UniProtKB/Swiss-Prot annotation:
Belongs to the chaperone-like protein of POR1 protein family. Essential protein required during embryogenesis. Exhibits holdase chaperone activity involved in the stabilization of NADPH:protochlorophyllide oxidoreductase (POR) proteins against photooxidative stress during POR proteins import into chloroplasts. Required for chloroplast biogenesis and development. When expressed in yeast, triggers mitochondria-mediated cell death associated with the loss of mitochondrial membrane potential. One of its GO terms (biological process) is embryo development ending in seed dormancy. This is Protein CHAPERONE-LIKE PROTEIN OF POR1, chloroplastic. PANTHER family: PROTEIN CHAPERONE-LIKE PROTEIN OF POR1, CHLOROPLASTIC (PTHR33372:SF2), PTHR33372. The gene is CPP1. Coiled coil: none annotated. The chain crosses the membrane at residues 162-182, 207-227, 237-257. GO terms for cellular component: chloroplast; chloroplast envelope; chloroplast inner membrane; chloroplast stroma; chloroplast thylakoid; chloroplast thylakoid membrane; mitochondrial membrane; mitochondrion. It is a multi-pass membrane protein. It comes from Arabidopsis thaliana.
């Protein structure tokens, strides 16, 4: 009986204890492999994310390492601005979505813009220096004439141009009723007023204004008869057309003379 119990006990112990060991081994191996699987999956996810941020399967720009901006954009060094803009827009559309390609294209385009700006600036400086040199080398009478000329602000030019253009239009509108004597008088008074503001001398302003009116009237009386008659309205008299030339002289004298 005891032997049977011993045998049964050994059987019981073997049936419960022996199988439990491999189960523990299997579980431990599974639990030990799980972190490595998670790490590998996360690594693949990060790798895919990085690839997608830098373009992934998007075509890449093949000239990213080309130093010359003209060669990088595929244009000639003598290309115009329109051609450079067209090349830049075409390349950005072709390689859109790839960050490094877009940065390379934009970098080359910005270099060309800066070089164009510097070249224009140098051209303007050289032009000013050449003009200044020519003025210094000009004869004395030309220097004295240039001393009487100045360049006012653009808003002043436009305001006075509008005033004398209005006087000319008013004279044309009233050409059927009478001559432009009143409009000419108003224009002369405005010219003298503007010159007096500038020179602070009423006598000098009157002298320049009357001289401009006489010069304009004289030039108009010489130029107008040379114009073919089919270009002139029948109601436009010689006096009216001469006054229009005089308005131009009055505008120039009160705007650019000092």
């Amino acid at each position: 009986m005891s032997s049977s119990l011993l045998l049964s006990g050994s059987t019981v112990s073997s049936s419960f204890i022996a199988p439990s060991k491999p189960s523990l081994v299997r579980n431990s191996s599974k639990t030990s492999l799980l972190p490595f699987r998670n790490v590998s999956r996360s690594f693949k996810t990060v790798k895919c994310t990085v690839d997608s941020s830098y373009g992934g399967n998007v075509p890449t720009f093949p000239r990213t390492r080309v130093w010359d901006p003209y060669k990088r954009l595929g244009v000639s060094p003598y290309a115009s601005e329109e051609e450079i803009w067209a090349s830049r827009n075409f390349l950005l559309q072709q390689y859109a979505g790839h960050e490094r390609s877009e940065e390379s294209i934009e970098g080359a385009f910005e270099k060309l813009l800066m070089s164009s700006f510097i070249r224009r600036k140098k051209t303007k400086i050289n032009l000013k220096s050449k003009l200044k040199k020519k003025v210094e080398e000009s004869p004395p009478w030309l220097k004295a004439l240039l001393d009487f000329v100045e360049m006012p602000p653009m808003d002043t030019i436009f305001r006075r141009l509008f005033l004398f253009a209005f006087m000319g239009g008013w004279s044309i509108m009233n050409s059927a009723e009478g001559g432009p004597a009143f409009q000419v008088a108003v224009s002369l008074a405005a010219c003298v007023y503007f010159l007096n503001e500038k020179t602070k001398s009423l006598g000098r302003a009157c002298l320049i204004g009357i001289g401009a009116l006489v010069a304009g009237w004289f030039c108009g009386s010489l130029i107008i008869p040379m114009i073919p008659t089919f270009l002139i309205q029948p109601t436009w008299t010689l006096e009216l057309l001469t006054s229009l030339v005089a308005y131009v002289f009055l505008f120039l004298s009160c705007t650019f003379l000092k």
